[in-house]
Amino acid sequence: MVTFFKFNKNRINLLCGDLNVSPNEDDVWSHKQLQNVVSHTKIEREKLIKIMNKGKFIDTTRMFISPPENVFTWWSYRSKDFKKNNRGRRLDHIWVTNHQSLESLNAKIMIETRSLPQPSDHVPISYEFNLG
């Protein structure tokens, strides 16, 4: 992956998906309680941030939703009322390189899909941009 982005560094690159890591304290419901839990351990967070920095990626969601506001894309099925408990994590990401050549319009987390019948434990995220 690093090699691909190294050889394509002058292009606009998107990396998106379920990366299964919540890199920032604001990406989990309780940093203190989850710092030793898979998806938010120190080593996972450091490695993901290293990949982001090495690839010169920008976190599109955080372009529009700034810390300290929590951003979650995943809630456990164990919670009967995910909205009330709101014990989520942000495991899904959309990153972009060379964003200065894009007109960034919007990023959205579609939380309402988690309330559908038989939902996924993840909710979709979107990033809207104009290539010019």
Regions found by a protein language model. Give the residues of each.
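Generic structural signal for residues positioned in beta-strands
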Residues: D59, I94, N106, P124-S126
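Short acidic, gly/pro-rich beta-turn/loop elements at beta-sheet edges
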Residues: D27, L105, P117
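Surface polyanion/phosphate-binding segment centered on an Asp-His-Pro turn
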Residues: K108-G132
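Metal-dependent phosphoesterases centered on the DNase I-like endonuclease/exonuclease/phosphatase
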Residues: M1-V96
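Hydrophobic side chains in beta-strands
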Residues: R62, V96-T97, I109, F129
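Short linear functional motifs in flexible/disordered or boundary regions
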Residues: F72, N106-A107
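Short helix-loop capping/hinge motifs at secondary-structure junctions, enriched
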Residues: Q100-E103
